Amino acid sequence: MQKTFQLLRRGDLEAIRQILDKKPEEVNAVSGDKPKRDQGQSLLQVAIKSGHLDIADLLIDRGADLNFIEEPTELNPFCQPVIQTAGGRAVFDCRRMIKRWNGQYEMYSSKEKSDQSFKVFKKMLELGADISQKDSHGGTLLQTVLIETKEVLPSLLLENKRNKR
């Protein structure tokens, strides 16, 4: 199983597909102690979190648990439903200009990455992911999405404050 997570982290879609063809039950595999950053998380969570959305899409098509939430551990006391991970990723990957240290602006994320993140999130919603689930701090999907927008909307509003009426 650790090998599956390593292949996932490398973004090896074909290797993951082959594993699922041989062992369909692996679709809901949960990471063990290593790597620590993935401890207790599902393949789908790790695929979304690491930005391997083509693999996330495959896992969803193969029946991954859309309502999974990991158990708290000493290393990772914060637990989040996979739908919150997907919602946060969809906002995080949205196209926007970001200001770099040198004052120059550049586009963050590509149109393709943004569209893919949104597609995965929307697919999960359409397939019935439970949007009422709460994370270990009591936060909801809506709160997660709003928190993620802090990177997108406030800077845009502040940079355009001259547009007051």
Set out the residue ranges of the language-model regions:
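Conserved ankyrin/ankyrin-like repeat signature
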Residues: 15, 54-55, 116-120, 152-153
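Short, intrinsically disordered, charge-balanced linker/junction segments flanking boundaries
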Residues: 142-152, 159-165
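Extended HEAT/HEAT-like alpha-solenoid repeat tracts in very large eukaryotic scaffold/adaptor proteins
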Residues: 39-40, 113-120, 124
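Ankyrin-repeat boundary/"N-cap" motif
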Residues: 1-6, 29-45, 69-109, 134-146
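Ankyrin repeat domain, specifically the short helix-to-loop turn at the C-terminus of the second helix
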Residues: 18-26, 57-66, 122-130, 156-164
